[in-house]
């Protein structure tokens, strides 16, 4: 289930602004095993086709033109490649196949036996390093990648602020002359500290930082160092600051261990502990969340399609779940962790839903579609979307914020 979005949720609960929370990542992956395809495309030069060996991206070149200028890059973006793939799947020309056998057979012509044997080992090791299940799937399905292709398809949507996504906290950048005033203004009153959120003294790095994608692991490590140095500077500049919390240690203990206390109090009310009128176990909460997000918030079951009415219904169900979530119960420390993870997932999901509802366009075709606003609308929506949960009013507030180009964009307007 990847990470539960704790960074996003805790920032939101603190009243920090979030940015671009409508952005999600839906990569193509090896079907059922979730193995990565990037190495095959880039290192092994493999090609993907529909069931009839047609290059689906080239085939839908005219269709992709309606997303210009973004479709005019030398390498078509991931979401638009997904868009072409989804057309093939919906029109019955699946499955989509990654032709590992073509790539390896071509490589074999250029290599001696020793080099080729090493390449095959690399192909397997790529999955054994990152996704053991994919190697297991190949084995159990009798697939030898040098002889047979493998199915690929788009994944379920997920969040990340560091890889190919940009959802996360709205953070301050460096206090340098080249940074536009628009990107400094929100922090003028509380201080210009690199990677500080709009809550004074709350810093982020890596996945949690929004509008800062394509950092990957190494970039996230660097960003962690940037944030750490800025935190030290903040501490030195605020030596007299003495943070205090309202609650006592005992009150916090009761809150944190609340799900365990609830289970102990009510576990004997029924014969089977999973079915109990007094609580929900973490698995139940997660199943409800996944079902409603998939069906109403542009999940796989609707081919990533949604609209205003679906989103509003999803929000209604999500807020019912948020209310029921207060009755989470945990049998042990593992389920206690799961109970809190689910709380964070629900908060993150709510922010995501509200952002998709707020942005009245389809900014990322292939990742999600607004059926009622099916096009990219740069005239009105080439901007940041910001949200903030107000701890005083207990309400979400959403706004747009100007996007200022710093580095010249060859695809920009």
Label every PLM stretch briefly.
Residues 1-36, 217-230:
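Glycine-rich loop(s) and the adjacent beta-strand/alpha-helix scaffold that form part
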Residues 236-331:
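Long, amphipathic alpha-helical stalk/connector segments used for oligomerization, subunit docking
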